[in-house]
């Protein structure tokens, strides 16, 4: 698994040879204001949290999915047993496929420049199961590669 290093509140992978990582974690309390040099897709599995991104604060609940782009500053202000998955990656992980991937439904909003304010998706039950299965499979592949 990729390990994160902290320098001046900017997170980065220590191992750029494998530019994708799946992490699951539980937040409780506050997670300091920070940014990173990679894309972060976040899925909230359980719990709830107040989250700040680009000076906008919102409540996150189970089933929420959102993206943090490189350089965006964000923090979990008040997390209450928030269990989440992070899919962390660099654009080079898409290795030449990024122009095709961006054409897929919803991907231009995730990978392109923000056209408007920070947004999140709230998944229905079937979508949650599908996302969770995919994340768990990716996590297993990461550990067993």
Task: Cite the ranges covered by each PLM segment.
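Generic protein-terminus/edge-of-domain signal
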Residues: 1-61, 65, 102-119
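Short coil/turn residues that cap or connect secondary-structure elements
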Residues: 55, 142-145
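Histidine-centered divalent metal-coordination motifs
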Residues: 34-36, 74, 90
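Short loop segments at secondary-structure junctions
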Residues: 46-48, 71, 92
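Extended, non-catalytic scaffold segments that flank or surround catalytic motifs
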Residues: 24-26, 71, 97
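Catalytic metal- and UDP-sugar-binding loop of GT-A-like glycosyltransferases, i.e.
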Residues: 44, 68, 87-89
């Amino acid at each position: 698994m990729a390990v994160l290093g902290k320098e001046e509140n900017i997170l980065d992978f220590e191992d750029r040879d494998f530019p994708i990582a799946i992490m699951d974690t539980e937040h409780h309390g506050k997670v300091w204001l920070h940014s990173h040099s990679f894309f972060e897709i976040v899925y909230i599995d359980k719990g709830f949290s107040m989250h700040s991104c680009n000076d906008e604060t919102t409540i996150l609940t189970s089933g929420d999915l959102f993206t943090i782009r490189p350089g965006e500053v964000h923090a979990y202000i008040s997390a209450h047993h928030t269990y989440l998955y992070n899919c962390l990656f660099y654009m080079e992980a898409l290795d030449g496929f990024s122009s095709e991937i961006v054409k897929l439904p919803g991907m231009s909003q995730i990978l392109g420049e923000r056209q408007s304010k920070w947004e999140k998706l709230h998944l229905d039950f079937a979508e949650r199961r599908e996302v969770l299965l995919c994340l768990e499979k990716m996590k297993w592949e990461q550990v067993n590669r």
